[in-house]
């Protein structure tokens, strides 16, 4: 089995498409389900498959995020360049953090138009794509705390 993609409900499809386009997503396809309901499939240029679905149901009203969803993490090759690009697009990214110390990843956070949190992650050179079991084997790793809660969490 494999994870396919998350689906975010969005309030304003055009605004959301502009936001996700600014961080590098491209539209793969769109399905019109009638009554203004659309499913828009996005991916990054290097991805082979859809990695994010935007669900627009205008009759449902504005999106309310709630407390069940934390964030979407996006791997970037050049965090500084990405922050510069999103700033030029009128978006606001948080300052660069190094949650795992100097040997860990660099991260920055931003929010999409509906309030979904996006974590931008630049891994150190030589790190595998994404989080692996090796990230849990050392001390002081970057996964020890969940951003947004300000509290520390322990791994099991």
Model region roles, listed by residue range:
Residues 34-35, 62-64, 102:
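Short glycine/serine/proline-enriched coil/turn segments at secondary-structure junctions
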Residues 2-12, 30, 40-43, 61-156, ...:
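Vicinal oxygen chelate
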Residues 8-49:
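Core segments of cupin and vicinal oxygen chelate
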């Amino acid at each position: 089995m494999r994870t396919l993609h998350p689906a975010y409900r969005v309030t304003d499809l055009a605004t959301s498409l502009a936001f996700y386009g600014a961080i590098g997503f491209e539209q793969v396809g769109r399905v019109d389900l009638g009554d203004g309901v659309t499913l828009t499939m996005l991916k990054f240029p290097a991805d082979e498959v859809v990695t994010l679905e935007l669900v627009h149901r205008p009759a449902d009203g504005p999106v309310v995020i709630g407390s069940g969803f934390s964030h979407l993490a996006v791997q970037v090759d050049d965090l500084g360049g990405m922050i510069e690009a999103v700033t030029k697009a009128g978006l606001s990214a948080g300052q660069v953090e190094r949650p795992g110390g100097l040997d860990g990843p660099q991260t920055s956070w931003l929010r999409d138009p509906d309030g979904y949190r996006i974590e931008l992650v630049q891994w150190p050179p030589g790190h595998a794509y994404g989080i692996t079991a090796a990230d849990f084997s050392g001390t002081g790793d970057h996964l020890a705390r969940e951003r947004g809660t300000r509290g520390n969490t322990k791994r099991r």
